[in-house]
């Protein structure tokens, strides 16, 4: 998860009342200008600018820190954005919070090997690292990965709407999406 981009540098590190965390996203937000204006009116600020544009990942992080917990913050993201956003957060305790967008458009895959769990958007990243696919997150599902177990923080919703372009345009050819290649 995350992108290589001149306009959306990732990961970014945030220090907030939730603690320090790093965040990466795969997002397409169509109401970013409205959200930016709303956050600025709440005396929030944006530090990650490139080509005079707001970094989507920073905007997502600012929506997250409006919550009392990471789960509440991620649900705040789902509530406010138009579009989709899947994300990974690396927390201070070394655990990873993985969240799939509420429509299930972009994949989040959990892999496991002895003594470790990992999350990715492309299952093809696992074999060379000796991981096996453990599961695919459902729409809106949130989990927390520790080295020896995974805790579900939010159950998946209904109505998977995976992006069909994965199979044709931008998905990696050797990756599996929802168990299909």
Please name every model-derived segment.
Residues 1-138, 144-181:
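Conserved short alpha-helical segments that host acidic/polar catalytic motifs at enzyme active sites
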């Amino acid at each position: 998860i995350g992108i290589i981009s001149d306009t959306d540098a990732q990961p970014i590190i945030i220090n907030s009342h939730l603690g320090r965390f790093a965040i990466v996203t795969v997002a397409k937000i169509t109401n970013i200008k409205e959200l930016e204006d709303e956050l600025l009116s709440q005396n929030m600020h944006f530090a990650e600018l490139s080509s005079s544009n707001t970094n989507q990942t920073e905007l997502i992080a600012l929506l997250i820190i409006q919550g009392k917990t990471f789960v509440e913050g991620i649900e705040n993201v789902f509530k406010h954005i138009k579009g989709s956003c899947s994300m990974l957060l690396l927390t201070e305790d070394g655990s990873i919070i993985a969240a799939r967008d509420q429509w299930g458009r972009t994949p989040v895959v959990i892999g496991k090997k002895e003594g470790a769990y990992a999350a990715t958007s492309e299952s093809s990243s696992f074999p060379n690292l000796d991981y096996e696919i453990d599961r695919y997150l459902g729409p809106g599902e949130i989990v927390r990965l520790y080295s020896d177990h995974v805790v579900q923080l939010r159950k998946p919703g209904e109505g998977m709407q995976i992006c069909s372009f994965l199979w044709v345009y931008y998905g990696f050819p050797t990756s599996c999406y929802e168990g299909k290649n």
